[in-house]
């Protein structure tokens, strides 16, 4: 890794099928062992199932689900004089979105269901309705930050 300067962040191009940047990011999180076409198929099937069940626009529901699962604050460990404090910090938008996508995929994988598409569709619909494990994780993260508010002055 170069010490000279940080690598330039490449822009995320919108997904060719859904014309959506978040869909591209979701495909990247779903992908295992470089199998991008399989990940795209899973997302497309999940959107099909969402459309079937709700009758609404799956992209709209997907964006709502991500918004509902995105944390605004998190706690980070900070050592001060031999003690480790959980310091609450604001989450940048990019990191928040990445965390939400990661949680949605991980909790989808741990769900009981037939296929990954069914599990992902279920988790996305739950998140859009402010339920589900990803939203619960966000609330948990916010509670932790609220409980450790006293250490906010240790922010770096």
Swiss-Prot record:
GO MF, any single term: structural constituent of ribosome
Quaternary organization: Part of the 30S ribosomal subunit. Contacts proteins S9 and S11.
Keyword rRNA-binding: yes
Matches recorded under PANTHER family: RIBOSOMAL PROTEIN S7 (PTHR11205)
Name of the protein in its database record: Small ribosomal subunit protein uS7
Natural source organism: Prochlorococcus marinus (strain SARG / CCMP1375 / SS120)
Keywords assigned: Ribonucleoprotein, Ribosomal protein, RNA-binding, rRNA-binding, tRNA-binding
GO biological process, alphabetically ordered: translation
Any one GO CC term of the record: small ribosomal subunit
Pfam families: Ribosomal_S7
InterPro entries found in the cross-reference section: Ribosomal_uS7, Ribosomal_uS7_bac/org-type, Ribosomal_uS7_CS, Ribosomal_uS7_dom, Ribosomal_uS7_dom_sf
Role this protein plays: One of the primary rRNA binding proteins, it binds directly to 16S rRNA where it nucleates assembly of the head domain of the 30S subunit. Is located at the subunit interface close to the decoding center, probably blocks exit of the E-site tRNA.
HAMAP family listed in its UniProt record: Ribosomal_uS7_B
Family stated for the protein in its record: Belongs to the universal ribosomal protein uS7 family.
